[in-house]
Amino acid sequence: MRLYSRPGNDLTHRFPLIADALARLRSRSCIIDGEAVACDDNGLASFERIRYRQHDGDVFLYAFDLIELNGDDLRRDPLQVRKATLGSIVAKARPGIRFNEHIEGDGPTVFAHACKMGLEGIVSKRKYSAYRSGRSPDWLKMKNPACAAVTREAEEDWSK
């Protein structure tokens, strides 16, 4: 198993904790949608540690969705089915891979909590939705305006 960035760069050797976890996945092959996360000394996500390659050995993967499993394309399957399958294949992969639970219900409260934790934001998905790359009417991305990564992204957009 290998770890790739969105543009296709092989990052397997850069993140040893994730690479070790990939070897423990319960599958021959898979494509997981996730995000590499490094935490600060308080246990909160630190964009700076990822950006400046600090503590690469402590970076783990938050697994959000499962796109392909053992050669089978799962993108048309409902989100709740993909999440259940994802949970079962990453169950033994901690601490390098962490399953991102699907929280049903009170989106505004979850978003407020994510903002208090300094997270970049959340993505709300309809539980019966198919997987689509890019934007989807079934997925709503809400960004924390106080997050350093979001602020930097806005500044870069304004400078164009």
Regions found by a protein language model. Name each.
Residues 1-160:
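Catalytic cores of nucleic-acid ligases and guanylyltransferases
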